[in-house]
Amino acid sequence: HQLLHDKGKSIQDLRRRFFLHHLIAEIHTAEIRATSEVSPNSKPAPNTKNHPVRFGSDDEGRYLTQETNKLEPYKEQPLKTPGKKKKGKPGKRKEQEKKKRRTRSAWLNSEVAESGLDGDHLSDFSTTSPELYLRRH
């Protein structure tokens, strides 16, 4: 599977380089034509700035993101002997999250029970708090 992936990547890289080379050649010719047709009295376009034109070298494609830095684009690799793969427990992650939730809810419930606050007392407090605030100020 990895071999096919690497081969596909190298083919895609070659296509991309060919496309860029072709595109750069068109840009070069278009730029030369545009500069030769400009009369000496006309002002340059507002978006164009006099920056030195720099195009990528042969190393251009080697350091792109999400690509491995390999010296050779594709190399035949020996096939791995099929070994026993380790398989994790299917729902292990979910079980761990459930345990965390259980412990969290148990901890919150125990705090509420220790403080002696029930839902009714909390609602009474919330209705009286604005009244207390108004009386103080």
From Swiss-Prot:
GO cellular component term, pick one: cytoplasm
Biased composition (Basic residues): 82-92
Composition bias type Basic and acidic residues, residue spans: 69-78
Stored Pfam families: Parathyroid
One of the record's GO molecular function terms: peptide hormone receptor binding
Motif (Nuclear localization signal): 68-89
Modification comment: There are several secretory forms, including osteostatin, arising from endoproteolytic cleavage of the initial translation product. Each of these secretory forms is believed to have one or more of its own receptors that mediates the normal paracrine, autocrine and endocrine actions.
Polar residues: compositionally biased ranges: 36-50
The keyword Secreted is annotated on this UniProt entry: yes
Keywords: Calcium, Cleavage on pair of basic residues, Cytoplasm, Hormone, Nucleus, Secreted
Subcellular location: Secreted; Cytoplasm; Nucleus
Region (Important for receptor binding): 17-28
Region Disordered: start-end pairs: 31-137
UniProt GO BP: adenylate cyclase-activating G protein-coupled receptor signaling pathway; bone mineralization; osteoblast development; regulation of chondrocyte differentiation
Function field: Neuroendocrine peptide which is a critical regulator of cellular and organ growth, development, migration, differentiation and survival and of epithelial calcium ion transport. Acts by binding to its receptor, PTH1R, activating G protein-coupled receptor signaling. Regulates endochondral bone development and epithelial-mesenchymal interactions during the formation of the mammary glands and teeth. Required for skeletal homeostasis. Promotes mammary mesenchyme differentiation and bud outgrowth by modulating mesenchymal cell responsiveness to BMPs.
Quaternary data: PTHrP interacts with PTH1R (via N-terminal extracellular domain).
Record-stated family: Belongs to the parathyroid hormone family.
Identification of the protein by name: Parathyroid hormone-related protein
Species whose genome carries this gene: Equus caballus (Horse)
